[in-house]
Amino acid sequence: MTTAQTQELDVQPTPLALLLLGREADPRSERGVECPGDLPSPSDPDLVARARAAKEKLGDKVFVLGHHYQRDEVIQFADVTGDSFKLARDAAARPEAEYIVFCGVHFMAESADILTSNDQKVVLPDLAAGCSMADMATAEQVAECWDVLTEAGIAEQVVPVSYMNSSADIKAFTGKHGGTICTSSNAERALNWAFEQGEKVLFLPDQHLGRNTAVRDLGMSLEDCVVYNPHRPNGGLTAKELRDANMILWRGHCSVHGRFSLDSVNDVRERIPGVNVLVHPECKHEVVAAADYVGSTEYIIKALEAAPAGSKWAIGTELNLVRRLANRFAAEDKEIVFLDKTVCFCSTMNRIDLPHLVWTLESLAEGTLVNRIEVDQETEAFAKLALERMLALP
């Protein structure tokens, strides 16, 4: 279990990384933690200067990580940018930094805490910055799933593979049961490794990345995959369906990438003749199949860097990154548009804004530790084991 700690507040940890407003939640609070009363106003004209001053005062004691999906107002203060795993490794490579300020979401901060030393303190500027996909698989649900696999007589044949976008509890379960973690960049290698260890894979929490990797990269058929729904008895599957399947996909998805549809692809091709469609593998299978290129955020960035002048691109990933890339490459005569007509931000990622970052940096500069993300030792040990298996992948 993970605790989020604020020295000045006596709060109880919540079981999920994100307590959605509307589910018996107080709109004046964030995941059971009172909103800081001295949070700066978004209209404060001195926010940039305040953030810069606090960061300079902290010096080498602080290391700010910025995920690709963050707002520009936050990214400008990041010491490094990248995807979740790259940032966690970047944090581990800076042992002199006492504070790791992770401008991302909860599971990312957990991963950074797992990979950094016990002396380092990982901080999340807004505790409500969770991940709906990571929250789609709880430890209790996954344990129940394993019981279902055991009753079907196949648990010993199953190797769990968990996406980096999962909670520390799920990573720990994966490590404890002989599995590995994967990213969107190395999912193919992770699955190949898993099938060398066992006959079947339980892939969680993102069904789309699992399906796309199995079918597109490993040459499986859609019939080789079944979807386990944690909200239905026995996952909505019969014992025979489980025994016949090679890939058991958890019924989870990214709310951002799940919005893209085949209509989105067809529409942009009609509007922009000659456009290259480049999407993230968290998109639905039919979208990935219709795209010209598929890859992680790092792949998307590198593909656009290498693209020739005059080329046209429709990108299926989070809007903050797409806008940033469009602005960056406009001078090189590369036309870059968002794949869908509908604006599609990651709402929880966008909870990290400049006021929260300023409040965090100023609090740390004043000697007050806020919003610490800390994974307990047992969970950390098994989660780290799963991460180390990933690092050792051929």
Swiss-Prot record:
Pathway(s) served: Cofactor biosynthesis; NAD(+) biosynthesis; quinolinate from iminoaspartate: step 1/1
Catalytic reactions of this protein: iminosuccinate + dihydroxyacetone phosphate = quinolinate + phosphate + 2 H2O + H(+)
Keyword Cytoplasm set for record: yes
GO cellular component assignments: cytosol
Listed HAMAP family: NadA_type3
Main location: cytoplasm
GO biological process, one term: 'de novo' NAD biosynthetic process from L-aspartate
Enzyme type, top EC level: transferase
Protein family: Belongs to the quinolinate synthase family. Type 3 subfamily.
Gene Ontology terms for molecular function: 4 iron, 4 sulfur cluster binding; metal ion binding; quinolinate synthetase A activity
Binding site for iminosuccinate: 67, 84, 163-165, 184, 280-282, 297
Gene3D superfamilies for this protein: NadA-like (3.40.50.10800)
Protein name in the entry: Quinolinate synthase
